[in-house]
Design a protein with these regions (language model features):
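Internal mixed-charge
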Residues: 185-258
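Conserved short "hinge" loops at termini or chain/domain junctions
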Residues: 1-5, 13-15, 73-77, 150-215, ...
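Preference for long, well-ordered alpha-helical segments
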Residues: 255-258, 263-267
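Signature of Asx- and small-polar-rich beta-strand/turn repeats characteristic
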Residues: 1-156
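Charged, low-complexity surface segments at secondary-structure and domain boundaries
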Residues: 103-122, 167-179, 206, 210, ...
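Generic intrinsically disordered, low-complexity segments enriched for polar/acidic and small residues
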Residues: 6-7, 16, 37-39, 151-153, ...
Length: 281
């Protein structure tokens, strides 16, 4: 089951494997021993998108740089303004994190109506998938053997944001998830899905990729994450849960978000915070 409609294919020297379900199921993993100049991760969604969250099972240990390309209807174009928060000491996919990028404003990111048609990437011609925008990820140096990712999706806030609101939050990791739990990434991803659902109910977005700037929704997502965490900690945490809920609703009701209203993957002048929003009483 796809909780977010994200198609994920791993190309191992041109041989495609569909990991769309595994990418959104924490019980499964995806081997990602990318070989430089040969292997790619292809990601398709209905609308352009400028970020993805990687949750790792086994980190890469080799110094390597990740980059992104998108399909413009004719060729793969290099994405610009690429930011990789999975990078640690020059090693991409060394920790959980978000990658962000932007399409080149001089070359549009076009939808591929059918991967079997002319105008579609030849690398995907053995598939038959309709109406998606495709991008691919590659690395400069082959990743270490045994690199494995656990999840690929969206996360609109980070663990340090939770700690800034509740400095004691990490004391609840073991009571919440046992001795093996070391972060709140799964709860952050769930909260991010809740945020998208609530924004959709307000008519502000139609897909997670429409959220172009995290600073618009990161604090709201943090409070929604805290609600989820407190809900399993018993009645003593009911006041904190209520406070988190009130702050969450207040933040989502603010007017002024940067959403991709024209569906081109770019945060343009008319879309930057202040031009899109809704006030709910």
């Amino acid at each position: 089951m796809l909780h977010n409609w994200i198609r994920v294919f791993y190309s191992d020297n041109g041989v495609l494997t569909d990991y769309s379900v595994e990418a959104q199921n924490n019980a499964d993993t995806i081997p990602l021993e990318l070989v430089a100049g040969q292997d790619y991760v292809y990601v398709g969604q209905y609308f352009p998108f400028n970020n993805l969250f990687f949750q790792l099972d086994t980190a890469n240990t080799v110094v390597s740089v990740m980059s992104a390309q998108y399909w413009d209807g004719k060729v793969w174009r290099d994405a610009v303004d690429f930011i990789d928060s999975t990078k640690l000491l020059g090693k991409t996919l060394a920790r959980n994190g978000v990658i962000q990028w932007s399409p080149d404003r001089n070359n549009s990111w076009l939808k591929t109506e059918d991967t079997t048609d002319r105008g579609a990437p030849t690398e995907l011609s053995t598939l038959e998938i309709y109406e998606l925008h495709w991008m691919r990820l590659k690395v400069s140096v082959s990743l270490s053997a045994g690199t494995i990712i656990k999840d690929l999706g969206y996360a609109f806030t980070a663990n340090h944001m939770l700690s800034s609101i509740d400095p004691e939050i990490n004391e609840y990791l073991v009571p919440w998830g046992g001795v093996s739990k070391t972060n709140w990434d799964e709860q952050i991803q769930l909260a991010s899905n809740h945020v998208v659902a609530d924004l959709r109910s307000r008519g502000l977005v139609v897909a997670p990729g429409n959220v172009l700037r995290f600073d618009d929704v990161s604090l709201a997502t943090a409070y929604r994450t805290l609600q989820i965490i407190y809900s399993r900690l018993g009645e003593a945490f009911a006041p904190r849960k209520q406070d988190a809920q009130e702050n969450y609703e207040k933040l989502l009701n603010l007017k002024g978000f940067t959403f991709d209203t024209n569906r081109n993957g770019l945060a343009e002048k008319q879309e930057i915070a202040g031009t899109t929003g809704g006030l709910v009483r």
